[in-house]
């Protein structure tokens, strides 16, 4: 694996003609030079989809053998791990039901986080295995695409800093009971400050203490603790319906390579969901209206594919996913074939309807430069398209970027858009749908 500068140097040394320089420049400017994302890259998986989506850096450290070996053998990082293990063992006799004590035992403290940040940078400068980790995984995966313009060292360090923020967010929400971004739908399932819950956390600490002998990487104590907290609260939404490519979206993926895109004015119709506010109701009245709208447009031939976006959102801890319920209705009531339906059963907000829809477009090989259509009830289209409702500002506040570029509002139920590739960036500050 060579950097662009190394390739140029090698070409110059071999006296390759100018056309080779031009070809290399064109190659990099069209692909990896711009953002590094490779649509042919296949994400690696650990035993936990929740970890994979929230902390893909950690999955890579576990699943890429050369990088894992480098990290395991490093004395500095191994020293941090040993310090954490020692605190956990001390916690067995000292923490009792003190939540902060258990958090301090499992999580790297600020000094350790800074030391890890520094050491990862040093390793990236001198170890080929860590350089390859960035160049062959972090960059082409798209999972860290917000940092595409950074150097390899800076990208790796930024990924670590972001992961630390994600761990802390989970600890705050599911151990300390602090209000997160969307507390009404994403909070702990138990009263976090109750003695009962504190006892649960104490038991979890003792349970995980038995696992410490199997941990060989610096991130594992905090990651295991965070994932355990989410499991205790039945917060596995990010993992539900995975692997989608082999399950719910399998038929669509088989169909996509055979689509004649020129026959359709739009690549996809994105359909945001609407969760019912009443328990035991699978599909809300608004959801039913939206299903009929998108079915009508599909049967008119406006697009070959429909993306249904909406997760397990309303009411709190609902057993129904908006996307799967809409899919049932489209197939059973409106005769839409399964091969034309892609589901995103994870989005929890209108912002992430667009973000997740964009991700599916880029990852599933749908032409991203072709216009797409968002179809919904008039109230939501007004909210999306009318500047006075500040939907763009909400995206910038919650995501840090716009996952779409809006074009014409062609009716009260439809607005045109194109996806933005920055949507591929994974967000551990939204752990139920990162």
Model-inferred region functions:
Residues 35-434:
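A structural signal for short, hydrophobic/glycine-enriched beta-strand patches
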Residues 1-34:
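Bacterial Sec-dependent N-terminal signal peptides
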């Amino acid at each position: 694996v060579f950097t662009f500068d190394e390739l140029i140097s090698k070409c110059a040394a071999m006296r390759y003609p100018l056309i080779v320089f031009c070809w290399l420049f064109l190659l990099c400017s069209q692909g990896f030079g711009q953002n590094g994302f490779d649509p042919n890259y296949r994400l690696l998986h650990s035993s936990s989809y929740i970890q994979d989506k929230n902390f893909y850096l950690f999955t890579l450290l576990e699943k890429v053998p050369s990088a894992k070996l480098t990290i395991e053998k490093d004395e500095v990082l191994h020293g941090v791990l040993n310090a954490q293990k020692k605190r956990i063992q001390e916690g067995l006799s000292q923490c009792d039901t003190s939540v902060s004590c258990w958090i301090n035992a499992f999580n790297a403290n600020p000094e350790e986080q800074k030391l890890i940040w520094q050491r990862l940078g040093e390793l990236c400068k001198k170890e080929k295995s860590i350089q390859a980790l960035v160049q062959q995984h972090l960059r082409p995966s798209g999972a860290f695409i917000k940092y595409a313009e950074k150097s390899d060292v800076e990208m790796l360090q930024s990924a670590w800093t972001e992961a630390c923020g994600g761990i802390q967010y989970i600890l705050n929400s599911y151990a300390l009971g602090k209000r997160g971004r969307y507390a009404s739908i994403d909070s702990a399932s138990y009263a976090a400050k109750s003695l009962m819950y504190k006892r649960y956390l104490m038991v979890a600490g003792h349970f995980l203490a038995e696992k410490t002998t199997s941990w060989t990487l610096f991130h594992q104590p905090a990651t295991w603790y965070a994932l355990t907290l989410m499991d205790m609260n039945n917060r596995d939404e990010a993992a539900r319906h995975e692997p989608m490519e082999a399950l719910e979206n399998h038929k669509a993926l088989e169909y996509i390579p055979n689509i004649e895109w020129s026959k359709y004015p739009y690549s996809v119709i994105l359909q945001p969901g609407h969760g019912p506010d009443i328990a035991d109701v699978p599909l809300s009245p608004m959801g039913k209206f939206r299903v009929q709208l998108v079915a009508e447009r599909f049967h008119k031939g406006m697009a070959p594919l429909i993306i249904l976006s909406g997760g397990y959102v309303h009411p709190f801890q609902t057993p129904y996913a908006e996307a799967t319920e809409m899919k049932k209705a489209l197939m059973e009531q409106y005769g839409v074939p399964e091969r034309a339906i892609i589901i995103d059963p994870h989005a929890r907000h209108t912002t992430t309807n667009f973000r997740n829809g964009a991700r599916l477009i880029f990852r599933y090989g749908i032409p991203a430069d072709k216009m797409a259509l968002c179809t919904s009830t008039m109230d939501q289209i007004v909210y999306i398209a009318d500047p006075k409702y500040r939907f763009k500002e909400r995206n910038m506040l919650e995501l840090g970027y716009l996952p779409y570029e809006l074009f014409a509002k062609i009716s009260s139920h439809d607005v045109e858009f194109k996806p933005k590739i920055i949507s591929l960036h994974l967000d551990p500050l939204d752990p139920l749908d990162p």
